[in-house]
Structures are given as C-alpha cells and as structure tokens.
C-alpha cells in the first residue's frame, strides 16, 4: 500500500487574540496524483490549511505528514519540507520579490543552492514551459494580473515540488484566462505533480477536479471522488450553491439523464443535448 502524499491528523490552529480556532481536529488523507478542489465558505479555513501544509504556520496541535515524514519545525527539516510542497498565494504580489520575470524565477533556485549553470538551465526550461520567454526581462510591475500569477506559479514549479497548492487561482480572471489556467494545470498534472486548489469557483472546480474536499467548521467534512460528490451535490454542500452546468443538467427530464454521467464541460453538455435532440428527431 502506497504512503499518502499528505496527511493531517487532528490538526488544530487558532490565530492569536481570536476566541475560536480556525481548524479543530482537522483530519484527512491525500493520495498522490489527484486534482483536488478544496471548497468551503469564506472564513472556513482553506487558506489557513494551506499555510499549515506549506509549513508557513505552526500548528497548535495534531500532526502533519508528507510522504510519511512528520512535519518538524527545524531549519533543515523545513527546507526539505518546502521543497516538496509549493504554494502559490491568491495575491501574486505576496511572493514576487525581484525586479524582472527571470530574476524572480531565479531567486528560489539560487536559494536552493544550485550552481549558476544549474540555475540557468532550470530557468530556461521554466520560461519555456510557462510561455514566459518573451517576458523574461520584463519588469514585474509592467505585467497584468494574469501574467503575474503565471510568473508566481512558474517560480514555484521551478523548484519541482511534489505537491502544488493554489489559493483562489481564478480570482479576477476572465473566461479566456481561466481556460489558459486550466490548460496549464493539466500540463503540470500530466508531469506528475499533485495539485490542490482552494476555491470559491464552483464552475472551475466542477470541470477540473477529480477529487473534492469540503471544509466546514474547521474540519474536512467531505473527501471523495468528484463524480460521487457532484452526483449527490445537494446532500453534501447546498450552502455553497450549485455549479452552473450541473444545475442545467438537473433541470432536464429525468429520462434524459438516466444512466448517463453528468457533463463536466460545456462541450460535453452540448454533445449530450445534441445527441438527445437527434434521437427525438428520429422518433418523430
């Protein structure tokens, strides 16, 4: 049996000067290879969970493991931990630290202690993979929000983490930028990286994730296959609303939907409707 990639065991955390903990006895297991959407209402603790997983915050109680290794807040152990878990913040300004795109991506590589030739090689590869070659010498303050997010993500992925955590990656992105993000995440996932996004964007989660986790009152109340969760969505999280495509699918006659998987993309939905209308035409 394989060792889980990430484990939380009864983890608790409370911010200073606040009466109630954000996370309380929070437990879950994450297997490698997943595309996970972490869902929850505002203030449910999604970002806090990420900061704890990335060892930016120290838990008050409980244990956290990555690939079977316990999180210990000692300099050398933290260095190794943070090489395995990469975190991209909701606001890219929080992690862009250099003047230009190339310098920012190189910053983390230099901190790893790589030699100049190794840094140059990894930088060149990352610029190509993230379509940033033309922007390599561009000052960061000249970039759009979408470009800054791409640079921040490139800086994280240049370090080759095993697990990638993305905090609200679709915020303020238009439809085209969201599609570009989806394609980029698919590419990263195909290279072997496990990805978890914390998001309020149900439509993005619905079309992208293969695993759903729902955070309620400081605990992971649901951790299951996306097909199962969305197939019985009102049972799990009615307070979060309903993904648009799922809502449209549920409005169709039950006979249309019987024994058919619900569509996860607009293309799949259109194909299902087209096929059904063709059958109706044949019957007429």
Curated annotation (Swiss-Prot):
Coiled coil: none annotated. The keyword Nucleotide-binding applies. It is found in: Cell inner membrane. Residues 6-242 form the ABC transporter domain. It is an enzyme of class 7 (translocase). CDD domains: ABC_cobalt_CbiO_domain1. It is a peripheral membrane protein. ATP binds at residues 40-47. Keywords: ATP-binding, Cell inner membrane, Cell membrane, Membrane, Nucleotide-binding, Translocase, Transport. Its EC number is 7.-.-.-. It holds the Pfam family ABC_tran. GO terms for molecular function: ATP binding; ATP hydrolysis activity; ATPase-coupled transmembrane transporter activity. SMART domains: AAA. One of its GO terms (cellular component) is ATP-binding cassette (ABC) transporter complex. It comes from the Bacteria. Belongs to the ABC transporter superfamily. Probably part of an ABC transporter complex. Responsible for energy coupling to the transport system. This is Putative ABC transporter ATP-binding protein tll2439. It comes from Thermosynechococcus vestitus (strain NIES-2133 / IAM M-273 / BP-1). The lineage of its organism: Bacteria, Bacillati, Cyanobacteriota, Cyanophyceae, Acaryochloridales.
């Amino acid at each position: 049996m394989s060792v889980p990639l990430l484990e939380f065991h009864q983890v608790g955390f409370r911010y200073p000067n606040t009466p109630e903990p954000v996370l309380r006895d929070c437990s879950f297991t994450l297997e490698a290879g997943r595309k996970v959407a972490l869902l929850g209402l505002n203030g449910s603790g999604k970002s806090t969970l990420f900061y704890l997983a990335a060892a930016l915050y120290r838990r008050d109680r409980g244990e956290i493991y990555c690939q079977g290794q316990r999180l210990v807040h000692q300099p050398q152990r933290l260095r190794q931990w943070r090489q395995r878990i990469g975190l991209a913040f909701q606001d890219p300004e929080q992690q862009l630290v250099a003047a230009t795109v190339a310098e920012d991506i190189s910053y983390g590589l230099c901190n790893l202690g790589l030699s100049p030739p190794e840094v140059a090689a990894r930088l060149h590869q990352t610029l190509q993979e993230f379509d940033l070659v033309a922007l390599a010498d561009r000052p960061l303050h000249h970039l759009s929000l979408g470009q800054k997010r791409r640079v921040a993500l490139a800086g994280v992925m240049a370090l080759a983490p095993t697990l990638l955590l993305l905090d609200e990656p679709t915020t303020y992105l238009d439809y085209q930028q969201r599609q570009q993000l989806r394609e980029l995440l698919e590419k990263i996932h195909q290279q072997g990286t496990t990805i978890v996004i914390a998001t309020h964007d149900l439509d993005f989660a619905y079309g992208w994730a293969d695993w759903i986790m729902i955070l309620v009152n400081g605990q992971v109340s649901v951790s299951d296959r996306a097909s199962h969760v969305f197939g019985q969505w009102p049972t799990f999280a009615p307070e979060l609303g309903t993904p648009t495509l799922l809502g449209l699918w549920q409005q169709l006659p039950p006979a249309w939907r019987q024994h058919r998987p619900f569509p996860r993309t607009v293309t799949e939905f259109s194909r299902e409707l087209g096929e059904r209308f063709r059958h109706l035409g044949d019957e007429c």
